[in-house]
């Protein structure tokens, strides 16, 4: 819902700019809307007094976001030593070697974490029976082919404990990854099969845990580093052997049931006591306790798909929609007496053209809705034929500020959607 509201607000702001822009030859400039990006984009930048106008627009925007009618009047500033001591005690910032205050940007870190969570995928892979006894095979889904950074990976195993008395209350469960080392190359299928039987295998301990053997329950084994190594090697298969040397003393057993084992046990169950119904119930319960691998992963920062989604930076060489960097130092505008941190504001804004061939592509558009509208407009369909696309922010990030109010109180405020990160066509 917040994302839809933001998109609606940006589209409405863009429409206001188009409607309120003066016609050629008219005097003055239209009133700047609250959106700093749109306001700065409409200001003339090729005239000598353009910079002061842009700075004034930034000032008004900051005061508006802080819900202030005017800048606070700091007549008796707090002594710097007292200020720095309070900041250290309250952990709202840190003091650099030069004496400047650096605010703890918790909200920025939270926004980055939320963005990473949105880009993270969760994959659950159920175990298949391995080629050897007490081994499991996990085949990671192809959905994870673009995911190269493992956030978390866990193997879930169910330990079944009988109700009879036991001699042990704890058992150790170990997960050993099986690795193959081929011996040379094979030319024919027969040679390949023979080589597979003769190849060297090694085991590596990837997870170990001491668990309670007094009750039947699930146990979680972290295997993040092992899965990360597999992905780094371009592999998608994990073979592990489960070892529990003390389990036989307690009567406990790990449920290691895959599809292959189920078929084998179905045949055995029919032979024993002719109890097909009872065996079926047990098998169903066993299947509900089937081991699985839970994987949380995301794309790397340099993944080509992620790079394509980033907006353009204005470099003076392009005239299509891009982000223009604009930094205002609070010291330069005389506001460092009441704003403690940060030292300035990145008042980035969007500018540039949105030609039909650019606005109609999903990679540069604000939304799928914008792409559809532009496709209709290109075909001359009413009522979209006369609509024009404009360059607006598509991604905003928050900003934290530390400042004095009129009562000389120190205020820390986290302001959402303050800094333009990316631009696109509406």
Swiss-Prot record:
<dbReference type="GO" id="GO:0001541">
    <property type="term" value="P:ovarian follicle development"/>
</dbReference>
<feature type="disulfide bond">
    <location>
        <begin position="321"/>
        <end position="391"/>
    </location>
</feature>
<keyword id="KW-1015">Disulfide bond</keyword>
<comment type="similarity">
    <text>Belongs to the TGF-beta family.</text>
</comment>
<dbReference type="GO" id="GO:2001241">
    <property type="term" value="P:positive regulation of extrinsic apoptotic signaling pathway in absence of ligand"/>
</dbReference>
<keyword id="KW-0372">Hormone</keyword>
<feature type="disulfide bond">
    <location>
        <begin position="354"/>
        <end position="425"/>
    </location>
</feature>
<dbReference type="GO" id="GO:0042701">
    <property type="term" value="P:progesterone secretion"/>
</dbReference>
<dbReference type="InterPro" id="IPR029034">
    <property type="entry name" value="Cystine-knot_cytokine"/>
</dbReference>
<dbReference type="GO" id="GO:0045648">
    <property type="term" value="P:positive regulation of erythrocyte differentiation"/>
</dbReference>
<feature type="disulfide bond">
    <location>
        <begin position="350"/>
        <end position="423"/>
    </location>
</feature>
<keyword id="KW-0339">Growth factor</keyword>
<keyword id="KW-0165">Cleavage on pair of basic residues</keyword>
<feature type="compositionally biased region" description="Basic and acidic residues">
    <location>
        <begin position="263"/>
        <end position="275"/>
    </location>
</feature>
<dbReference type="GO" id="GO:0045893">
    <property type="term" value="P:positive regulation of DNA-templated transcription"/>
</dbReference>
<feature type="propeptide">
    <location>
        <begin position="21"/>
        <end position="310"/>
    </location>
</feature>
<dbReference type="GO" id="GO:0005179">
    <property type="term" value="F:hormone activity"/>
</dbReference>
<dbReference type="GO" id="GO:0042476">
    <property type="term" value="P:odontogenesis"/>
</dbReference>
<dbReference type="GO" id="GO:0042541">
    <property type="term" value="P:hemoglobin biosynthetic process"/>
</dbReference>
<feature type="glycosylation site" description="N-linked (GlcNAc...) asparagine">
    <location>
        <position position="165"/>
    </location>
</feature>
<dbReference type="GO" id="GO:0006357">
    <property type="term" value="P:regulation of transcription by RNA polymerase II"/>
</dbReference>
<protein>
    <recommendedName>
        <fullName>Inhibin beta A chain</fullName>
    </recommendedName>
</protein>
<dbReference type="GO" id="GO:0043512">
    <property type="term" value="C:inhibin A complex"/>
</dbReference>
<dbReference type="Pfam" id="PF00688">
    <property type="entry name" value="TGFb_propeptide"/>
</dbReference>
<dbReference type="GO" id="GO:0001942">
    <property type="term" value="P:hair follicle development"/>
</dbReference>
<comment type="function">
    <text>Inhibins/activins are involved in regulating a number of diverse functions such as hypothalamic and pituitary hormone secretion, gonadal hormone secretion, germ cell development and maturation, erythroid differentiation, insulin secretion, nerve cell survival, embryonic axial development or bone growth, depending on their subunit composition.</text>
</comment>
<keyword id="KW-0732">Signal</keyword>
<comment type="function">
    <text>Activin A is a homodimer of INHBA that plays a role in several essential biological processes including embryonic development, stem cell maintenance and differentiation, haematopoiesis, cell proliferation and tissue fibrosis. Signals through type I (such as ACVR1B or ACVR1C) and type II receptors (such as ACVR2A, ACVR2B or BMPR2) which, upon ligand binding, phosphorylate SMAD2 and SMAD3 intracellular signaling mediators that form a complex with SMAD4, translocate to the nucleus and modulate gene expression.</text>
</comment>
<dbReference type="GO" id="GO:0008285">
    <property type="term" value="P:negative regulation of cell population proliferation"/>
</dbReference>
<dbReference type="InterPro" id="IPR017948">
    <property type="entry name" value="TGFb_CS"/>
</dbReference>
<dbReference type="InterPro" id="IPR000491">
    <property type="entry name" value="Inhibin_betaA"/>
</dbReference>
<dbReference type="GO" id="GO:0043509">
    <property type="term" value="C:activin A complex"/>
</dbReference>
<keyword id="KW-0964">Secreted</keyword>
<dbReference type="GO" id="GO:0061029">
    <property type="term" value="P:eyelid development in camera-type eye"/>
</dbReference>
<dbReference type="GO" id="GO:0045944">
    <property type="term" value="P:positive regulation of transcription by RNA polymerase II"/>
</dbReference>
<dbReference type="GO" id="GO:0008584">
    <property type="term" value="P:male gonad development"/>
</dbReference>
<comment type="subunit">
    <text>Dimeric, linked by one or more disulfide bonds. Inhibin A is a dimer of alpha/INHA and beta-A/INHBA. Activin A is a homodimer of beta-A/INHBA. Activin AB is a dimer of beta-A/INHBA and beta-B/INHBB. Interacts with FST and FSTL3; these interactions prevent activin A interaction to its type II receptor. Activin A interacts with ACVR2A. Activin A interacts with BMPR2. Inhibin A interacts with ACVR1; this interaction creates a non-signaling complex (NSC) that inhibits ACVR1-mediated BMP signaling. Inhibin A interacts with ACVR2A.</text>
</comment>
<dbReference type="GO" id="GO:0060021">
    <property type="term" value="P:roof of mouth development"/>
</dbReference>
<keyword id="KW-0325">Glycoprotein</keyword>
<feature type="region of interest" description="Disordered">
    <location>
        <begin position="177"/>
        <end position="201"/>
    </location>
</feature>
<dbReference type="InterPro" id="IPR001111">
    <property type="entry name" value="TGF-b_propeptide"/>
</dbReference>
<feature type="signal peptide">
    <location>
        <begin position="1"/>
        <end position="20"/>
    </location>
</feature>
């Amino acid at each position: 819902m917040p994302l839809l509201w933001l998109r609606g607000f940006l589209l409405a702001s863009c429409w206001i700019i188009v409607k309120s822009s003066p016609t050629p030859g008219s005097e003055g400039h239209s009133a700047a809307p609250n959106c700093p990006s749109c306001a700065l984009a409409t200001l003339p930048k090729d005239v000598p007094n353009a910079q002061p106008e842009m700075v004034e627009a930034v000032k008004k925007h900051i005061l508006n976001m802080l819900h202030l009618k005017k800048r606070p009047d700091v007549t008796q500033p707090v002594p710097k030593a007292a200020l720095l001591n309070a900041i250290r005690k309250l952990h709202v910032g840190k003091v650099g070697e030069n004496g400047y205050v650096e605010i703890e940007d918790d909200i920025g870190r939270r926004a980055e974490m939320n963005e990473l969570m949105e880009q993270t995928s969760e994959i659950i892979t159920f175990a298949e029976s391995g080629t050897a006894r007490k081994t499991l095979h996990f085949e990671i889904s192809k959905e994870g082919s673009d995911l190269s950074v493992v956030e978390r990976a866990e193997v879930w195993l169910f330990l079944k404990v009988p109700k009879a008395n036991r001699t042990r209350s704890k058992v150790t469960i170990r997960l050993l990854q099986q690795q193959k080392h081929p011996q040379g190359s094979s030319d024919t299928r027969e040679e390949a099969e023979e080589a597979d039987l003769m190849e060297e295998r090694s085991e590596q301990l990837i997870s170990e845990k001491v668990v309670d053997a007094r009750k039947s329950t699930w146990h979680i084994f972290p295997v993040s580093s092992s899965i990360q190594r597999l992905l780094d090697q371009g592999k998608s298969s994990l073979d592990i052997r489960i070892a529990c040397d003390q389990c036989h003393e307690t009567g406990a057993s790990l449920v290691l049931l895959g599809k292959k084992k189920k078929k084998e046990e179905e045949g055995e169950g029919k032979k024993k006591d002719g109890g097909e119904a009872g065996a079926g119930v047990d098998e169903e319960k066993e299947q509900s306790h089937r081991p699985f691998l839970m994987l949380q992963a995301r794309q790397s920062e340099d993944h080509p798909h992620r790079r394509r989604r980033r907006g353009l930076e204005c470099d003076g060489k392009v005239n299509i929609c891009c982000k223009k960097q604009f930094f205002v130092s609070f010291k330069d505008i005389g506001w460092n007496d009441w704003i403690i941190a940060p030292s300035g504001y990145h008042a980035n804004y969007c500018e540039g053209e949105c030609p039909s061939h650019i606005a109609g592509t999903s990679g540069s558009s604000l939304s799928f809705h914008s792409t559809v509208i532009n496709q209709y407009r290109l075909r001359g369909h009413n009522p979209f034929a006369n609509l024009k696309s404009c360059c607006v922010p598509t991604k905003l990030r928050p900003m934290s500020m530390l400042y004095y109010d009129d009562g000389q109180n120190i205020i820390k405020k986290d302001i959402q959607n303050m800094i333009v990160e990316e631009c696109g066509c509406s």
